[in-house]
């Protein structure tokens, strides 16, 4: 990373993330908000899957899921997660690690109300991560929920809401020629952040 970059890029990781995310939304052809969420179970087995970022501010990074899913079970067991954004068009990655907490019921309700009605119905129809005997069974449950909520609003299911990852470490990675990549690490320190570079 050049001295010019060090002095012109934001020194607050949340500001830097907003800057990079804005560039990704302008250049990434598919789902710039897609991120990998890594968790680990009580048995030590790691697990990873893609979700969509639905909120970001100084408190952390928010995504939504079924609280009875495998990912939610592991998050509630350990209270920690790692996130990864990979924007191929920019040849950049952002890695985030930290503790996890549930969003407030009010936040969950507000976000659920913005979802397309079909997605709201789907949240009621799916027993996420549980065995399914056939696609027909799932589709029948969906039709059942359509009838149940016909003509009225669809409330947020009690088992469906969000998690917030409060970052303790945020690393920004930029591809460079000759594998001389740039790695800029922010580590939470009290109410602020310490910053440094890493060898690639």
UniProtKB/Swiss-Prot annotation:
Question: A Gene Ontology MF term for this entry?
Answer: FMN binding
Q: Which residues does the record give as FMN binding sites?
A: 49-54, 64-65, 70-71, 93, 128-129, 173, 183
Query: What is any one GO biological process for this UniProt entry?
Result: pyridoxine biosynthetic process
Pathway given in the UniProt record: Cofactor metabolism; pyridoxal 5'-phosphate salvage; pyridoxal 5'-phosphate from pyridoxamine 5'-phosphate: step 1/1; Cofactor metabolism; pyridoxal 5'-phosphate salvage; pyridoxal 5'-phosphate from pyridoxine 5'-phosphate: step 1/1
Instruction: Give the PROSITE patterns listed for this entry.
Output: PYRIDOX_OXIDASE
Q: Taxonomic lineage per UniProt?
A: Bacteria, Pseudomonadati, Pseudomonadota, Alphaproteobacteria, Sphingomonadales
Assembly: Homodimer.
Q: What is its EC number?
A: 1.4.3.5
Q: Where does substrate bind?
A: 54, 111, 115, 119, 179-181
Organism (species):
Rhizorhabdus wittichii (strain DSM 6014 / CCUG 31198 / JCM 15750 / NBRC 105917 / EY 4224 / RW1) (Sphingomonas wittichii)
**What name is this protein filed under?**
Pyridoxine/pyridoxamine 5'-phosphate oxidase
Keywords on record = Flavoprotein, FMN, Oxidoreductase, Pyridoxine biosynthesis
EC category: oxidoreductase
Which Pfam families did the record assign? PNP_phzG_C, PNPOx_N
* Cofactors, names only: FMN
Listed as disulfide-bonded, the cysteine pairs are none
Q: In UniProt terms, what function does this protein have? A: Catalyzes the oxidation of either pyridoxine 5'-phosphate (PNP) or pyridoxamine 5'-phosphate (PMP) into pyridoxal 5'-phosphate (PLP).
Give the encoding gene's name: pdxH
Q: How is the cofactor bound?
A: Binds 1 FMN per subunit.
Query: HAMAP family per the record?
Result: PdxH
Which family does the record claim for this protein?
Belongs to the pyridoxamine 5'-phosphate oxidase family.
* Catalytic reaction list: pyridoxamine 5'-phosphate + O2 + H2O = pyridoxal 5'-phosphate + H2O2 + NH4(+); pyridoxine 5'-phosphate + O2 = pyridoxal 5'-phosphate + H2O2
Q: What Gene3D superfamilies is this protein classified in?
A: Electron Transport, Fmn-binding Protein, Chain A
